[in-house]
Swiss-Prot record:
This is Acetate kinase. Mg(2+). Can also accept Mn(2+). Its main location: cytoplasm. Substrate binds at R90. It comes from the Bacteria.
Amino acid sequence: MTRTVLVLNSGSSSLKFQLLEPDSGASLADGIVERIGEDSSSASLVCGEREVTHSERVPDHEAALRTAYGLFDEAGAELGSVGLVAVGHRVVHGGPDLYQPTLIDDALVDTLESLAPLAPLHNPPAVLGIRGARKAFPDLPHVAVFDTAYFHDLPAAAATYAIDRDLSEQWHIRRYGFHGTSHQYVSEQAALFLDVPLSSLSQIVLHLGNGASASAILGGRPIDTSMGLTPMEGLVMGTRSGDVDPGVLVYLWRTAGMSVDEIETMLNKRSGVRGLGGEIDFRVLHQRIESGDESDRENAQLAYDVYIHRLRKYIGAYLALLGSTDVIVFTAGVGENDAAVRRDALSGMGRLGIELDEHLNESPSHTARRISAETSPTTVLVIPTNEELAIARACVEVI
């Protein structure tokens, strides 16, 4: 029987799940439970040509897992009869010591709970998903795959913050980086697409989704990335601020009377594109820029301009770090689907060797493709990320 892996990605209010054949790369089923804990919870699963949906309230992550398993049964893909060999879990933060795909036991779950302060939006729901899945599949191996793993060996100059070194060492403060599974997968796919050795390429990878990060990759090894100790640093994101002067936080605490928890919530949930433009969906943002009322239009335009400005700054910085860049890759929801973001991120860079083909950039596609002009010294690609497949393949290597 063909072996399969169930991959779980537990968010703060959602559970994504996918059943994959790691050997062939085929996705057998793909689903999501959304708005966990709300009255408007919904769940859906696509399995082959069948789509199954549910709309009843899902109170917590354990219930979300039960809902997911029920969807598989309803779609005729009972998890007990599909050759399931492992369950893979995306875990955002592995801290200083966890940077390899790791078999999950009770001690590891306790360790992941202790790392919650480093990724408060991501690690706690991952632990909930792990606990529920281990209860549902006690006889299967469960494997944690860490977002931070790919960036574990960043050069010291990139990983080190210029703060008191004793404090950094005592509290393991460094640039950890995130979306590592995606950055690694996409950079490897770029080499395959171009049919050249990964070791020969210098790349800038732009993972632009609700969370967003950039990386500079030389010969298959990352030399810098935009996210830091936590997933809040770097690019402007859907609800996260990205780079911000630390003095702003001290000012808000000391002068505005905000608590640490209030500041953290503001930075994570009420900042970024939503904080400036009131919306995280770029399709809506573009609509407001084109046809919203004056206030909505101005706010949306500012949010978009700040987003693009920050993105261009990081691209420029990484061009300087790499010296020369063979490939720039766009991936994730915004990177794969928003032609305007790609155009504006790279406009005016012809003298730096980066030229887009307007027609190719505007042409939608769900497969890897080149969008740079034939005359462009730097190749620009759009490559769909597939973190779930990368996690599934990491699982079978461990077990």
